[in-house]
Amino acid sequence: MGAAESSMFNSLEKNSNFSGPELMRLKKRFMKLDKDGSGSIDKDEFLQIPQIANNPLAHRMIAIFDEDGSGTVDFQEFVGGLSAFSSKGGRDEKLRFAFKVYDMDRDGYISNGELYLVLKQMVGNNLKDQQLQQIVDKTIMEADKDGDGKLSFEEFTQMVASTDIVKQMTLEDLF
């Protein structure tokens, strides 16, 4: 491992929920996923991860992991995204990741349209569009405490307060 890579690993160890040995295992997994050896994972490579491939929100996951919007996920972004799913990841970190799933334009709010689009990805054609829109409208109305027509992170946090988000967003077997 060169000095630059060693420095990157030290930084990742400080800023993620992973130990040095866990980061080494993640690096090996990342390199296996990076089929073309480009140093980053594109959408097709990302969808080879079993826990993500079967998720109806797989494309949202890619967008969240891809912090810089380059269309690919480098190792640091990979670690950053997975860190929220670590058993060492706290409630706030998991809530922030979940919020990002819905905040498609990254403006810090979940709009009616964003909530609709994400829920549509989750339910597919199991609900009629009109039924889904009614659920979205009711959710926004009930959770939107300041009446601005959208959900802030704080409002989102209150809305999901009764759920066990820590358990639901922890992947025991990341390696």
UniProtKB/Swiss-Prot annotation:
UniProt-annotated binding residues for Ca(2+) 3: D103, D105, D107, Y109, E114
Membrane-spanning residues: none
Binding site for Ca(2+) 1: D34, D36, S38, S40, E45
Binding site for Ca(2+) 4: D144, D146, D148, K150, E155
GO-annotated cellular components: calcineurin complex
A Pfam entry, by short name: EF-hand_7
A molecular function (GO) term: calcium-dependent protein serine/threonine phosphatase activity
Boundaries of every EF-hand domain copy: 21-56, 60-88, 90-125, 131-166
Highest rank taxon of the organism: Eukaryota
Keywords: Calcium, Metal-binding, Repeat, Virulence
GO BP annotations listed: calcineurin-mediated signaling; cellular response to pheromone; conjugation with cellular fusion; intracellular monoatomic ion homeostasis
Family: Belongs to the calcineurin regulatory subunit family.
Subunit and partners: Composed of a catalytic subunit (A) and a regulatory subunit (B).
Further details from the record: This protein has four functional calcium-binding sites.
Role this protein plays: Regulatory subunit of calcineurin, a calcium-dependent, calmodulin stimulated protein phosphatase. Confers calcium sensitivity. Plays a central role in virulence and antifungal drug action.
Protein name: Calcineurin subunit B
Organism of this sequence: Cryptococcus neoformans var. neoformans serotype D (strain JEC21 / ATCC MYA-565) (Filobasidiella neoformans)
